[in-house]
Amino acid sequence: MFEKTNRMNLLFDFYQELLTTKQKAYVSFYYLDDYSLGEIAEEFEVSRQAIYDNIKRTEESLEKYEEKLGMLKKYQQREKLFSQLEAQLTKKNFLDEQVKDTLEQLKNID
């Protein structure tokens, strides 16, 4: 469950602008704020089943966006390469503060 929550949070970060206002709210409450389905249903005055169905559809949408656009996959690949580069530079004593700052800037472009 923890892995799924992390994945959904990351997908939400990348693709939330493609979701409806309602989808954003439900997913945000459920995954980011850790509300239960019942708490969200009470907040929006709808049934628990309606919240569940909407969240499941939204999860499917987020996965489809990732399948087509691959933003999360590319992000994870870049992070892995940055870590490898940092380790290689450290090993060869080439990692000074200026290089560290440049690597950080590259990481934060997205």
Curated annotation (Swiss-Prot):
SS bonds (residue pairs): none
InterPro entries reported in the protein's UniProt record: RNA_pol_sigma_r3/r4-like (IPR013324), UPF0122 (IPR007394), UPF0122_fam_protein (IPR054831), WH-like_DNA-bd_sf (IPR036388)
Domain of life (superkingdom): Bacteria
Pfam families tied to this protein: UPF0122 (PF04297)
Function recorded in the entry: Might take part in the signal recognition particle (SRP) pathway. This is inferred from the conservation of its genetic proximity to ftsY/ffh. May be a regulatory protein.
Family classification: Belongs to the UPF0122 family.
UniProt-listed PANTHER family: UPF0122 PROTEIN CBO2450/CLC_2298 (PTHR40083), UPF0122 PROTEIN YLXM (PTHR40083:SF1)
HAMAP family on file: UPF0122 (MF_00245)
Protein name: UPF0122 protein Lm4b_01818
Organism: Listeria monocytogenes serotype 4b (strain CLIP80459)
